[in-house]
């Protein structure tokens, strides 16, 4: 083999090695590009997923805020309705309290009422000796009916007539004044207590109005508003 043949063989080997290297490099390049595209696609999908999750989270938060706002508005409206209902009911009670003043103006009827109130207290206390307090302006009426009240109680309770001491030093408050309707006052009635003061029966017109109003409040609300509310 001469030098020319050797040179040609070497050139062929070089071309073969170069071609093989180029093919291998091309394969590596294609593979790398495929891996890059796959990784890029995965990153894009991951970012899309994150964006969707963030959007869903914000959407849920917005829904929660809407529900909270609606609940607060609904509660505020309910409070306003209840307040308006309370105002109406309290206005009725205030008017009833004003009407109580008319009770004592009918002397004959009020005198009979005082006797009945005294008898009720005596039946509740069931004490042989009690202290009675009334308004100073009612003192004469109370003293006028006291004996009859004691006898009526004794007949109903089947006991001896009790000793009833009328307090002429400390009286119940006077009727409410027009310039101070919410000051300390009493529209009429009596308060009886055991002599040791441990048992008290408050039978004033104001106290009876409070009790009656409290007991009838559900009925009043239902009659006015069509439902019973707390």
From Swiss-Prot:
Disruption phenotype: Mutant embryos are lethal, displaying variably enlarged cells with multiple nuclei, large vacuoles containing inclusions, abnormal organization of Golgi stacks, and cell wall defects. GO terms for cellular component: cytosol; cytosolic ribosome; Golgi apparatus; plant-type vacuole; plant-type vacuole membrane; proton-transporting two-sector ATPase complex, catalytic domain; vacuolar membrane; vacuole. It is a peripheral membrane protein. The modification Phosphoserine is found at residue 178. Belongs to the V-ATPase E subunit family. Subunit of the peripheral V1 complex of vacuolar ATPase essential for assembly or catalytic function. V-ATPase is responsible for acidifying a variety of intracellular compartments in eukaryotic cells. Required for Golgi organization and vacuole function in embryogenesis. This is V-type proton ATPase subunit E1. The lineage of its organism: Eukaryota, Viridiplantae, Streptophyta, Embryophyta, Tracheophyta.
């Amino acid at each position: 083999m001469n030098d020319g043949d050797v040179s040609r063989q070497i050139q062929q080997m070089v071309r073969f090695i170069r071609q093989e290297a180029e093919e291998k490099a091309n394969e590596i390049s294609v593979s790398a590009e495929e891996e890059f595209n796959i990784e890029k696609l995965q990153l894009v999908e991951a970012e899309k997923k994150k964006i969707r999750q963030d959007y869903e989270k914000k959407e849920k938060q917005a829904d929660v805020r809407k529900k909270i706002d609606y609940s607060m508005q609904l509660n505020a409206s309910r409070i306003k309705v209840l307040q308006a209902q309370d105002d109406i009911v309290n206005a009725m009670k205030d008017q009833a309290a004003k009407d109580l003043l008319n009770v004592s103006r009918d002397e004959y009827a009020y005198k009979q009422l005082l006797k009945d109130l005294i008898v009720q207290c005596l039946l509740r206390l069931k004490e042989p000796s009690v202290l009675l307090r009334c308004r100073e302006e009612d003192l004469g009426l109370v003293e006028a009916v006291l004996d009859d009240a004691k006898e009526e109680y004794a007949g109903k309770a089947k006991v001896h007539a009790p000793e009833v001491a009328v307090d002429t030093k400390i009286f119940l408050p006077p009727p409410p004044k027009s310039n101070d309707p919410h000051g300390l006052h009493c529209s009429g009635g009596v308060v009886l207590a055991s002599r040791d003061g441990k048992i008290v029966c408050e039978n004033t017109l104001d106290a009876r109005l409070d009790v009656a109003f409290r007991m009838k409040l559900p009925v009043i609300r239902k009659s006015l508003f069509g439902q019973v509310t707390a």
